[in-house]
Amino acid sequence: MLTQYQPLKLNTHIGIGIPWDLDRNIGGVSILPPYERSTSSEWYTGTANAIYQNLNYMEYYNPDYVLILGGDHIYKMDYQVMLDFHKANHADITMATIPVPIEEASRFGVCITDDTHRILEFEEKPEHPRSNLASMGIYIFSWPVLKEALIQLKDQKGCDFGKHILPYCHERGDRIFAFEYNGYWKDVGTLGSYWESNMELIDLIPVFNLYEEFWKIYTSNEWIRPQYIAGDAVIDKAIMGDGCEIYGEVHSSVIGSDVVIEEGAVVRDSIIMNSARIGKNTVLDRAIIAEGSIIGENCVLGAGEDDIPNKLKPDVYAFNLVTVGEKTVIPDGVTIGKNTAIAGKTTIDDYPDNTLAGGETLIKAGDM
C-alpha cells in the first residue's frame, strides 16, 4: 500500500491487516510511504512514479503478475476472475473497464476495443469521447512488461499510468485488453462523490450492499461500549457505529463510532465521523464532520442559499456541503452556510454576527 499525504489515520486503520486476514508470515500488507534513498528522494509525483520508487520492493518478490489498484474507489471485485482473463488472452496488460454514460466519459480514460476485447485506442479524459468504456484505474501487468515501462519512463515528470505508461505500451505494440466490469463502482476522489456514496449505503437495499451473506465487508473495529438510543430519540434511515449516544434526531445519515448527538439536535443527510459531539438544539444539513469535532449548542450548519461557490477552493468545497475538519471546535449559537469549510478551535469572535456565510472558509490552524 503506497501512502503519501497525511497518512497517519490510514496507517493506523490498516495496521498489520488483522481484520482482513493479512497478518501473514509470507505476503500480507506492507505500507510504503516515500522514503530517503541513497541516490535521490522525492514525494510520489504520479501513480506510475509511486510504483517506480518501490521497484526494489517488487523485485524482491519477483512476481509473475502485478495488480495495481487505486485507493479512492468503492466496488467489489474478484481479482482472480480478472487474472484468469489476463492469462487466457496472453495479455501483457489488462485494464478493468466499466460502461459509463457517454456524457460523463470525458471524466475518465476511455478505450476502444475490437471483438476480442483487445484495446485498439486509448484516450485519457478526452474532450470529445468516442467510447463510453471507461478505465477503472485497475490494472494487471505481466511483471517484465511493467518493469521495462517504468524504467524507460522513469524521468517522465508526474509519470501516470493513464497518461504515460498505457500510451507508451500501446505504441510499442503490447497486448492490452479490456476486462469489462458491470457491478457497482464509484470514484470517491471528491467530497461530493464521497458524500453521495455514503448516502447510498442507507437505502433500503443499497446498490453497494454491505449485508450480503456471500460477500461480507470487513473493517477494523474498536472495542467500545454498545450504542445507546434515548427514548425520545428519532432515527430514520441511518447507519451507526458502536458507542453512539443518540438523544436527538437522525435522518438519512451515517454516524461513526463513539458519536454523541444531544437532545434537540437534528442531523439530516450528513456524515459524522468517530468521537464527534453535536450539541443541544443544533441542526446539521448535508454536513461532513471529521473525527473528534465538537459542534456547540444552538448552531445551524448548512443554512442559506444553494450553489454559492467557495471563495478559496471552489472545486473542492462544493456540492452544498459543510466540511468540518478533524478536532474542530465550533462555538454555541453559530450559523454556517453551504459550500463552507471550517478547521481548528474556533471561537465566537471568528464569526461576524455569529455567522459564516456560504462560500467562506475558516481555518485556524493547519490545513484541510
What are these language model-derived features?
Residues 1-202, 309-315, 319-320, 326-327, ...:
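Unchanged
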Residues 144, 151-368:
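Left-handed beta-helix
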